[in-house]
Amino acid sequence: MPNLRPLAIALGLGLATLVVTDASAAPKKKAAGRAPAVSAQCSDFYDATNAGWLKANPVPQTGATTALGQLAERTRVQQRELLDGAMKSPQGNVQQLLGDFWASGLDEAAVEADGSKPIAPLLTRINAIKKAKDVPASIAALHQVGIPVAFNFAPDIDLKALDRHIGYFMQGGMGLPDPAFYTRTDADTVALMGRYRNYVKQILALTGTKPADLDAESQAVIALETELARNAQSLAGINNPFNNYAPISTKELTSRYRNLQLDAFLKAQGVNDDLVSLSDPALFKQLDGMVTRIKPEQWKAYLRWRVGDAMAPYLSKAYRDAEFEFRGRVIRGETIAPARWEQVLDAINVAAGPMVGREYAARHLSAEDRRQAAVIADKIRETQIEAVKANTWMSAEAKSEAQAKLAALKIEIGTPLRDLDYSVQPMGRGSFGSNMLIASTWRHREEMKRIGKGNADRRWDVLPQQPALAYDIAQNRLIVTAAVLQGPVFNAKSDAADKYGSYGALVAHELTRAIDAKGSLVDAKGELRSWWTPADKTAWNLLGNRVAAQFSGYEFPGVKGAKVNGELTREENLADLAGVELAWKAYLAAEPDAKPATQQGFFRAWASLWPQQVSPNEAAQRLTSDTMAPGKWRTNGALSNLPAFGATYSCKPGQPMQRVETDQIQVWR
């Protein structure tokens, strides 16, 4: 399916809940005295605000339940309703396509009767391979329909010219998520490889391999993938964008790797640019040799397997069951397959997500919602510019650069500014698998159009129907999806305190990214250039150290005896604090005469974003991997640094929700 960049910028949903106060912040009392009562708001604002939610949502046996997770679930139901409507009464060409796609996926009898027919043309082409020179053309044809084999090829930012995308040739073509699995010899990996071999056999049998040949062909497939893995980077290496950036002219590319016929490959993908990136010459030299060294029969088995594996979730039950038993249970750790409608929705979002997003925004995002969201985002930006001017830790040079970058920042709300070309081969309702290939081919075509100068902003790395609020560092833009503009993040009918405390604070959280340690690596013109002075870096690190120390003192809910990892969560915690600081300033500017009772709504709105209930197993996993602090501390940790919170709720310095002045951390206030 389409080889898209990971959607790593979606809004984090975080963790969960036990009642713990910051005992270290409480003043010492004489033994004989009796401590005065501390209000619930000044003791634990998270619990005081979210008591009703926490009671209504008990700790689950597995996974997590969160307020923002419930928002994500609601958007999926909204998408289902949209597709039901498109199926019954389509309005326009895009809805006709989506309605047919949806109907074909829900018709399980038709999917079962279809068997392997949707991929039959692809298998016929593969089986027609006679010589080594036929292999590259088959590789290119599969990439065209969104099934990357042998290697990956996808558009991404040109790191020396952020206004353009280039095509990246990278390692790929392996059926396991980590290349190390193919070469490790520990007992767990050996057991995993045994189950993987069985899965390969099942798919090969379904795609035409005779029973007598299954052992030999499955071994041939794994041998080919192992050869790819031996020359691949580690996962840590491949996730570093600078490790993958190595520009090369397409002319030189063709002369270096003649067997792979990469010039013909690029033409087949519709790419005419004169520059690509290929950072693993040893890997591609090896692959170039494999084209002629490996027998056509082995290539045919490998390509049939890759087609069957990629399409298995969208074909008959035999395919789906085999895929779920290995990828679902073993790789993803799932115990039960999702409901059919959820499987079909996921498939449509993979292949035709932008189409769904276009219709979703038209249905669920009003002009007034968009207008109000834009006004608040602009107010936050203005507030941040003024805060930069006034702050004491930034150098004059950095202040000038930061103001220029914030002034140039683009704000896109609801959907991307640039729409896509929705001309697609007509779909019917008789073959879900065939529709999947039609949509996947369209998605791949639109992805390839991103390559070239001036195309870098053609789409977002998140879909409009996914609740997300994100800063795109390469394009210096704030992205606010249509789906995120609903409760608990945004309600156009609520008062200003509510909107600024939730949506406004999240906007400010993201805008801080434009000028923080990472944002300072790209300037207002989109050039990779560090514009912080050494003194700026030192000042930011000192702020981060203080925040890390604060959060490291908090107990981790759900894991007995554990503390929050302040170092792991420091950047998110800094952005949270900056977010509530800026949003509060912007709110006061918008509502200067608001009474304390009204102002309290700002802080309740922030707390209402983060209620979470997490199972013990999930909490243990997140303790060591989650860069977001638990919801209790995202609420209390940030607010306890704000004098305005203490003033609004009459909290005294030293009480859990009001750190003493010398301990308070400030980023922009």
What does each model-found stretch correspond to?
Residues A48-G52, A56, R74, Q78, ...:
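Structured segments of extracytoplasmic/periplasmic soluble domains
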Residues P2-A26:
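Gram-negative bacterial Sec-dependent N-terminal signal peptides
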Residues W53-N57, L176-P177, P488:
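Short, solvent-exposed loop/turn elements at domain surfaces
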Residues S39-D44, A48-A113:
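Active-site-surrounding "flap" and adjacent substrate/cofactor-binding loops of secreted or lumenal enzymes
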Residues R34-K55, Y182-A205, R570, L577-L582:
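Hydrophobic/aromatic-rich, well-ordered segments within soluble, folded domains that form packed cores
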Residues V221, R256-N259, S277-F284, P338, ...:
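Intrinsically disordered, low-complexity linker/terminal regions across diverse proteins
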Residues A86-K379:
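Noncatalytic, helix-rich "gating/capping" subdomain that lines the substrate-entry/channel surface
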Residues S24-A37:
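Cleaved targeting-peptide boundary
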